[in-house]
Regions:
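Conserved nucleotide-binding/hydrolysis modules and their immediate coupling elements
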Residues: 18, 129, 261
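Pre-Walker A segment
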Residues: 1-44
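Conserved helicase motor core of P-loop NTPases
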Residues: 1-3, 9, 14, 32, ...
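Generic amphipathic alpha-helical segments used as scaffolds and interaction surfaces in large
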Residues: 17-21, 43-47, 69, 124, ...
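ASCE P-loop NTPase helicase motor core
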Residues: 27-30, 34-208
Length: 261
């Protein structure tokens, strides 16, 4: 029932059947996963995490056709996107997979049974707090492979802990970081520019209809620019299609509270 030690033949088969070509880094991630009971794949938007998962799932279903697979993510939206993008029939929220619900004091109640799966893949791990991670690790049985996928540069969970970053920092878990942003026909400039900014290359930003940069010297000036752009946008678009994302809830001139005032 174990996975083949030599993944090269399986990689060739899956790339051919799926009609895609992996980068060397993506192939390295697949090889790492194949020989690791616990492993991590990280990368920013558009770096090929989903493509890598598609190959992993294709290989697993071929070499272990009777193996139970569980895909999970912290939120309903993330789990639906995971199922759609990988082509797997179903993905669950972590709470549902673990049989958990929160009481009025935000304590987890419910399930205690081990996860009935041979391969567990969890996406958007940066959103998982310490308590949910503890429940997940407690329920994974010996012999079950656990693959964690996420972007360490995303905002950490609302709850306590920065689980993904701490797992990476410990240096004990096999990890591959995908660091090449692939330009696809419909790629968002926001995703591409996020990668560029992470690389510290502010001079190579791609500007267009979906990405503009409006400089401001003071926080108050920035807040006014945001409000001006918002008011202009809602005159041309449906009000429900326009959003403002602010870095803080109540701190500073550009907080959610001040902008709403």
């Amino acid at each position: 029932n174990s996975l083949p030690a030599d993944m090269d033949t399986e990689l060739i088969k899956s790339q051919s059947s799926l009609g895609l070509t992996l980068s060397e880094k993506q192939a390295e991630a697949v090889r790492m996963w194949a020989k690791s009971p616990l492993s991590i794949i990280t990368g920013g938007p558009g770096t090929g995490k989903t493509t890598t998962l598609r190959v992993i799932l294709d290989i697993y279903k071929r070499v272990r056709p009777k193996g139970e697979i569980l895909l999970a993510a912290p939120t309903g939206r993330a789990s639906r996107r995971m199922a759609e993008s990988t082509g797997h029939p179903e993905a669950s929220t972590l709470h549902s997979a673990l049989g958990l619900f929160a009481d009025e004091e935000d304590r987890y109640l419910g399930g205690s049974q081990p996860l009935e799966a041979d391969l567990v893949i969890v996406d958007e791990v940066s959103m998982i707090d310490m308590r949910l991670a503890a429940e997940l690790f407690r329920r994974v049985e010996t012999g079950t492979q656990l693959l964690l996928v996420g972007d360490p540069d995303q905002l950490p969970s609302v709850g306590p802990g920065n689980v993904l970053r701490e797992l990476l920092r410990c240096g004990l878990i096999p990890t591959v970081h995908l660091d090449i942003a692939y330009r696809q026909k419909n790629a968002s400039r926001i995703a591409l520019n996020a990668h560029t900014i992470n690389e510290g290359d502010k001079d190579s930003l791609a500007y267009g209809e979906d990405f503009r940069f409006l400089p401001a010297e003071q926080a108050g000036e920035a807040a006014q620019i945001v409000l001006d752009v918002y008011q202009e946008a809602v005159t041309h678009q449906n009000l429900l299609e326009v959003q403002i994302l602010a870095p803080f809830r109540s701190r500073g001139e550009c907080s959610v509270k001040r902008l709403n005032e």
